[in-house]
């Protein structure tokens, strides 16, 4: 570790503590008294990673007070009531597309991506179908975590209505039919329950523009509920569920790969996409077809190569038993066979789903066709997508998403107030404890 990194923590804490002290003087000398601070933090993607890191940094400079179960900043009692985050992706420094990095540099390193134990309630909504190699996701080892169908931005938002021909109702793009509407409304509900000072749904409905942003089309609700009861992917640990749903998505990609009426290029969503999206989707389809074709040929060649080696071994064994030397030229494997031999086990497994025409539940196919976007097709790294970037084999759709699960620290035990420095016990602690009790207690 460099000297700069060794000094970074103390220097940062010194700077932030100095700012907190100046802020404390402002608070003390102001005629309006700040009795407590109740904090809610929200974030999506790298913003969710920053939200996690922000909470850790905040508690670096917070001081313990009262019974040792609370904290203050600038002499004011604070409570971090709610952390609402969508599909946490750090990718700090060299992203996951580099073989020498996991994207966990600087402020995303160590336990910084864990959920701080002083967060009263954490809710994390994670995407089931994202595959991009430079979008590894941090699960929430504590708090409440829910898995939602779709890609990264199908959960956290970001796709415009009608992007890639999705979210259409009666032939027209409809923002209330986006998959992201469901986790948005669910997060709003969880935040309100936790005491976050947001507008209620009743207040939102009184404003036509806000009401539109929080709308959820009956068609989406119907298809989403059908998927919930019909996907058949099973339960289990969240990392395993993500893999199970990835397999189902890859099977659907395979179903849409072959020529004929089932081809992706013949689907309504492709035909109603705009020209640029059609180019991206068609290019991704071509790259996927080439990958499957090359790996399928490599699998076939490798099987033939191994069969030839087995036959040679048999002939050599027969010659040995008969006391005769056997000279047989050793066959060479094709380049495709060598390439196939190097692929990860997960890629081989997912390839077989495509080659075997694995079935896809109808409810899942409806969701994939009409709502789930293709993040690999539309995400460019320079002038390339992950599917065709030179000299890097990511295996595109034939891979699982990277998932991290960092546990972090346990919440501290409460301490006897007499053991704490007097300066850390604000005289307005009683009011904050009463507020905490009203919100569900400490």
Question: Which functions belong to the PLM regions below?
Answer:
Residues 1-442:
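Active-site- or binding-pocket-proximal scaffold segments within functional domains
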């Amino acid at each position: 570790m460099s000297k700069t990194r060794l000094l970074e923590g103390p220097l940062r804490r010194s700077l932030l503590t100095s700012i907190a002290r100046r802020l404390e003087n402002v608070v003390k000398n102001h005629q309006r008294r700040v009795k407590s601070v109740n904090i809610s933090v929200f974030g999506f993607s790298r913003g969710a990673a920053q939200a996690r890191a922000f909470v850790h940094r905040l508690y670096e400079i917070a001081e313990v007070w009262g019974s040792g179960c609370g904290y203050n900043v600038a002499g004011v009692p604070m409570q971090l009531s709610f952390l609402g985050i969508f599909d946490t992706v750090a990718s700090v420094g060299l992203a996951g597309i580099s073989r020498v990095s996991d994207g966990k540099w600087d402020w995303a390193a160590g336990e910084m991506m864990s959920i701080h134990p002083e967060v009263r309630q954490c809710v994390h909504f994670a995407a089931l179908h994202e595959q991009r190699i430079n979008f590894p996701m941090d699960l929430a080892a504590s708090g409440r975590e829910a898995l939602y169908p779709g890609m990264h931005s199908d959960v956290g938002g970001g796709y415009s209505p009608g992007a890639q021909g999705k979210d259409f109702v009666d032939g027209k793009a409809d923002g209330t039919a986006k998959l992201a509407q469901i986790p948005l409304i669910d997060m709003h509900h969880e935040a309100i329950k936790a005491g976050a000072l947001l507008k209620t749904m009743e207040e939102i409905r009184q404003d036509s523009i806000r009401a539109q942003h929080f709308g959820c089309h009956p068609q989406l609700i119907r298809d989403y509920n059908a998927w919930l009861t019909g996907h058949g992917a099973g339960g289990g640990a969240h990392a395993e569920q993500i893999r199970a749903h990835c397999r189902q998505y890859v099977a659907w990609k395979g179903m849409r790969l072959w020529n004929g009426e089932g081809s992706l290029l013949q689907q309504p969503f492709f035909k109603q996409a705009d020209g640029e999206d059609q180019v991206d989707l068609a290019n991704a389809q071509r790259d996927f077809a080439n990958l499957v074709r090359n790996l399928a040929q490599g699998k076939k060649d490798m099987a033939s190569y191994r069969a030839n080696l087995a036959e040679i071994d048999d002939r050599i064994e027969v010659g040995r038993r008969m006391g005769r030397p056997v000279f047989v030229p050793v066959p060479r494997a094709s380049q495709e066979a060598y390439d196939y031999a190097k692929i990860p086990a997960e890629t081989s497994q997912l390839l077989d789903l495509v080659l075997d025409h694995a079935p896809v539940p109808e409810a899942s196919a409806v969701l994939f066709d009409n709502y789930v976007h293709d993040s690999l097709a539309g995400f460019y790294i320079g002038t390339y997508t992950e599917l065709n970037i030179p000299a890097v084999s990511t295996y595109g759709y034939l891979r699982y998403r990277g998932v991290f699960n960092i546990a972090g620290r346990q919440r501290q035990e409460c301490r006897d107030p007499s053991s704490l420095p007097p300066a850390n016990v604000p005289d307005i602690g009683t009011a904050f404890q009463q507020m905490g009790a009203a919100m569900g207690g400490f």
